[in-house]
Amino acid sequence: MSSRMAGSAILRHVGGVRLFTASATSPAAAAAAAARPFLAGGEAVPGVWGLRLMSTSSVASTEAAAKAEAKKADAEKEVVVNSYWGIEQSKKLVREDGTEWKWSCFRPWETYTADTSIDLTKHHVPKTLLDKIAYWTVKSLRFPTDIFFQRRYGCRAMMLETVAAVPGMVGGMLLHLRSLRRFEQSGGWIRTLLEEAENERMHLMTFMEVANPKWYERALVITVQGVFFNAYFLGYLLSPKFAHRVVGYLEEEAIHSYTEFLKDLEAGKIDNVPAPAIAIDYWRLPANATLKDVVTVVRADEAHHRDVNHFASDIHYQGMELKQTPAPIGYH
């Protein structure tokens, strides 16, 4: 009798193990199999462990499926919005060589090859009182800039471009408002000045890839931009010929700064690192272009802006309005 009782106990334990190791065709069957040894008085730990493992796996798969469904729903919603407004973003732009275009801030047809053959030595000799005021105003601004940045031309270029991008936007905005008020065209000068502002902004986006401004330099940018925007706005309202002359002299100083930048690059004082990808695409530079190539094309852009603003000032000095002379649209 005692041997039968011992055998029954052994069979119960063996049965618990067999119930756990038997393959279940569904999670419900597995759960039932895990529960039997516990009800029969056997060890329940293996069955519970298996149930928990399968439960965790099931939860993970459910969460993954839910995320996939949410992502799919968002994609469908975006497509619906684009289709509703008629603005399709699915078409990918490509370069001339067929590779994908990765920039959203400018398009392939907005790129160009800079004209580096432009005369960099041109200078407008100040003759009138307003010209002299404009000239010495710019010269006075150069002195504190030299002290603050010294030979750190990367950060100096960053500061310069945050200022240089303001006049074109202010002038274009005021001409735009004037065109609306007077119901007259601008002779293309609105577009020319806004192109200048955009070009200067792209200079800034480029140098932000190679310069690492400190927090106080960023704070200085905010201060200088705020002061200069309002000052130039008032100056343009009072005297457009004076405002354009100031920008012409600012661009002459920019040419000088970038020339010094190039000298330090050639002397090895500044590392001639590879050109940022955004610069290679924007100016259509070769794939192996360097920082020196970038500074060279930026300097050429500044020379073109110098010519445009001195030209605009000369138009006003001759007693004409800008609309009377066709604007040099796309003059790079």
Curated annotation (Swiss-Prot):
Binding site for Fe cation 1: E161, E200, H203, E302
Gene Ontology biological-process entries: alternative respiration
Transmembrane regions listed in the UniProt entry: 157-177, 219-239
Organ and tissue specificity: Expressed in roots, leaf sheaths and leaf blades.
Gene3D superfamilies given in the database record: Alternative oxidase
Binding residues for Fe cation 2: E200, E251, E302, H305
Domain of life: Eukaryota
Keywords, in A-Z order: Disulfide bond, Electron transport, Iron, Membrane, Metal-binding, Mitochondrion, Mitochondrion inner membrane, Oxidoreductase, Respiratory chain, Transit peptide, Transmembrane, Transmembrane helix, Transport
GO cellular component, one term: mitochondrial inner membrane
EC number: 1.10.3.11
Cofactor: Fe cation
Catalytic activity: 2 a ubiquinol + O2 = 2 a ubiquinone + 2 H2O
Induction, as annotated: Induced by cold. Induced by drought and salt stresses, heat shock, hydrogen peroxide and methyl viologen. Down-regulated under oxygen deprivation.
Cellular location(s): Mitochondrion inner membrane
InterPro entries reported in the protein's UniProt record: AOX (IPR002680), AOX_sf (IPR038659)
One family name in Pfam for this protein: AOX
Topology in membrane: Multi-pass membrane protein
Molecular-function GO terms, alphabetical: alternative oxidase activity; metal ion binding; superoxide-generating NADPH oxidase activity; ubiquinol:oxygen oxidoreductase activity
Cofactor note: Binds 2 iron ions per subunit.
Range annotated as the organelle transit peptide: 1-54
Major location (coarse): mitochondrion
Cited function: Catalyzes the cyanide-resistant oxidation of ubiquinol and the reduction of molecular oxygen to water, but does not translocate protons and consequently is not linked to oxidative phosphorylation. May increase respiration when the cytochrome respiratory pathway is restricted, or in response to low temperatures.
Family: Belongs to the alternative oxidase family.
Protein name per its UniProtKB record: Ubiquinol oxidase 1a, mitochondrial
